[in-house]
From Swiss-Prot:
Its EC number is 5.6.2.2. It comes from Acinetobacter junii. Belongs to the type II topoisomerase GyrB family. It is found in: Cytoplasm. Heterotetramer, composed of two GyrA and two GyrB chains. In the heterotetramer, GyrA contains the active site tyrosine that forms a transient covalent intermediate with DNA, while GyrB binds cofactors and catalyzes ATP hydrolysis. It comes from the Bacteria. It is an enzyme of class 5 (isomerase). Keywords: ATP-binding, Cytoplasm, DNA-binding, Isomerase, Nucleotide-binding, Topoisomerase. The keyword Isomerase applies. This is DNA gyrase subunit B. Few gyrases are as efficient as E.coli at forming negative supercoils. Not all organisms have 2 type II topoisomerases; in organisms with a single type II topoisomerase this enzyme also has to decatenate newly replicated chromosomes. GO terms for cellular component: cytoplasm. InterPro entries: HATPase_C_sf, Ribosomal_Su5_D2-typ_SF, Ribsml_uS5_D2-typ_fold_subgr, Topo_IIA, Topo_IIA-like_dom_sf, Topo_IIA_B, Topo_IIA_B_C, Topo_IIA_bsu_dom2.
Length: 388
């Protein structure tokens, strides 16, 4: 019974649906010293469950052949299978999973003794990390198992993945809420105790704390509740306090026992808070600039006469000399020219404050007119529907 206490299935329809959509399904069950078999064709049993031998092993083998009557394409993607099986191996430390593709004689073996620690290491490969991986596993009093692994790196993105009974929740849920609350509280408490916030004169937010964070949250819940059949968000209320309590205890101890790592993490968070504040100020400056202000900027906009964005075109050209030629050859009624000087910033690799303080990027933002940032961006305000 213990094997199924935290099963991923909720409605008992998994193999039933596979069976209904298969032209053939074959079951082999090894249990209580005997081997049982049964076969189905388009969902109908071909014979009753029968004993075909003896064994000292346990386990179930399910083989199925998708029905061409249902699916127009029955080719399996080895990449999709590999991604999910690798994920399952990370989530279940010590479980060995073998993926064979007999079409091309390929075999992949997934066996990660380190579990979630190795999951974080795999995601952060090629990045510079700020701390050694923090990893803990604990069982709460209410039977909920909590496992967390995390590490900060030098990127600016948050990458947190949530799982309940090995099932991923892309929309998070109560386990994510508990994790975030404990993480922010633990870091704020550490920085206050070290007097870092007063000394650096910054106010940090939860977003600052999670910049560059890679984390895996895995909970084992006896009776999970999800927001929908697809299980993309966990809504079990008892999970939040379980995760929050476990994370509070373990993470606070980690920060105290690893002062160098704690200092590096705090430094990154303070930098993120400063960048956020600088970005806010720069965004306000950009917002105050109207399209008329662009004439005074290094990249001079030669606007078109047309006021309907659907009929207006914007040409981005390199340098003033190209801009001059383009202005002479354009159709003034509908074609606007914006010369941009020098090498434009690679915004994908730049922090938001650096991006928005770039003169050329600022010129572009103002010329396009649709704003920037989560609160400001509105594509309906775009001044040109054709940008070349």
């Amino acid at each position: 019974d213990n094997s199924y206490k935290v099963s991923g299935g909720l409605h008992g329809v998994g193999v039933s649906v596979v069976n209904a959509l298969s032209k053939k399904l074959h079951l082999t069950i090894q249990r209580a010293g005997q081997i049982h078999e049964q076969e189905y064709c388009h969902g109908d049993p071909q014979y009753p469950l029968k004993v075909v031998g003896e064994t000292d092993k346990t386990g179930t083998t399910v083989r199925f052949w998708p029905s061409e009557l249902t699916f127009s394409q029955t080719i399996f993607s080895v990449d999709i299978l590999a991604r999910r099986l690798r994920e399952l191996s990370f989530l279940n430390a010590g479980v060995r999973i073998v993926l064979r593709d007999e079409r091309v004689n390929l075999e992949n073996v997934y066996d990660y003794e380190g579990g979630l620690s190795e999951f974080v290491k795999y995601i952060n490969e090629g990045k510079t990390h700020l701390n050694e991986i923090f990893h803990f596993t604990t069982d709460a009093d209410n039977g909920i198992g909590v496992e967390v692994a995390l590490q900060w790196n030098d990127s600016y993105q948050e990458n947190v993945r949530c799982f309940t009974n090995n099932i991923p929740q892309k929309d998070g849920g109560t386990h994510l809420a508990g994790f975030r609350a404990a993480l922010t509280r633990g870091l704020n408490s550490y920085m206050e105790n070290e007097n870092l916030l007063k000394k650096e004169k910054v106010a940090v937010s939860g977003d600052d704390a999670r910049e560059g964070l890679t984390a895996i949250i895995s909970v084992k819940v006896p009776d999970p509740k999800f927001s929908s059949q697809t299980k993309e968000k966990l809504v079990s209320s008892e999970v939040k306090p379980a995760v929050e309590q476990a994370m509070n205890k373990e993470f606070s101890a980690y920060l105290l026992e690893n002062p160098q790592a704690a200092k590096s993490i705090a430094g990154k968070i303070i930098d993120a808070a400063r960048a956020r504040d600088a970005a806010r100020r720069a965004r306000e400056m950009t917002r105050r600039k109207s399209a008329l202000d662009i004439a005074g900027l290094p990249g001079k906009l030669a606007d078109c006469q047309e006021k309907d964005p659907a009929l207006s075109e914007l040409y981005l050209v390199e340098g003033d000399s190209a801009g001059g030629s383009a202005k002479q050859g354009r159709n003034r009624k509908m074609q606007a020219i914006l010369p941009l000087k020098g090498k434009i910033l690679n915004v994908e690799r730049a922090r938001f404050d650096k991006m928005i303080s770039s003169q050329e990027v600022g010129t572009l933002i103002t010329a396009l007119g649709c704003g920037i940032g989560r609160e400001e961006y509105n594509p309906d305000k775009l001044r040109y529907h054709k940008i070349i």
